[in-house]
């Protein structure tokens, strides 16, 4: 099962310094095909070939386990309670493993604000995995982001940017 929303960004939103392009949740069962279909162009990938995105994505695994690879990080185990950050221009692949599949949330974003954090060394392609454990606060933030994305109300991009900042802050601090 997958629920997701892809968003349109306008030039004024970009001036805010951080925009959100996608937010969603998926449950992958043991017998399910991964990745699931229904992703917009540029998002679907073959787990053997991987992909390169033009944005950051922050994923949170709430159940299950998997494996992550990128150009700078090889064969990193993923487990429930992990947040992992995908970087623009960075080849990567990941998928669930084990007997249980997994449940995950994601949010895709880009902008000068996040680029500056990478340049300052707060976020790095060499350390894309953060173990934060189970967090009802993080789940609530992802659910709020999905709700706001569905509404597409005026200034929703600014609210979504605040949610991303909160998620990244929790990831960095926990």
Regions found by a protein language model. Give the residues of each.
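Generic protein-terminus/edge-of-domain signal
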Residues: 1-75
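Short acidic-glycine-tyrosine-enriched beta hairpin
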Residues: 72-87
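Tight coil/turn sites that cap or link beta-strands
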Residues: 42-43, 80-81, 89, 99
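Amphipathic alpha-helical segments enriched in hydrophobic/aromatic residues interleaved with Lys/Arg
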Residues: 116-174
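Structural motif
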Residues: 65-67, 83, 91
């Amino acid at each position: 099962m997958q629920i997701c929303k892809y968003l349109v960004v306008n030039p004024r939103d970009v001036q805010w310094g951080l925009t959100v392009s996608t937010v969603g949740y998926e449950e992958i069962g043991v017998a399910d095909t991964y990745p699931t279909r229904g992703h917009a162009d540029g998002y679907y990938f073959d787990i053997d070939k991987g992909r390169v995105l033009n944005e950051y994505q922050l994923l949170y695994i709430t159940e299950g386990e998997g494996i992550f690879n990128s150009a700078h990080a090889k064969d990193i185990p993923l487990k429930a309670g992990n947040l992992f950050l995908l970087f623009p221009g960075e080849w990567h692949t990941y998928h669930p493993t084990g007997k249980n599949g997994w449940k995950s949330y994601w949010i895709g974003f880009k902008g000068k604000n996040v680029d500056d954090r990478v340049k300052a060394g707060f976020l790095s392609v060499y350390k894309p995995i953060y173990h934060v454990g189970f967090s009802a606060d993080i789940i609530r933030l992802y659910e709020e982001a999905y709700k706001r994305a569905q509404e597409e109300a005026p200034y929703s991009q600014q609210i979504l940017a605040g949610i991303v900042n909160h998620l990244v802050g929790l990831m960095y601090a926990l």
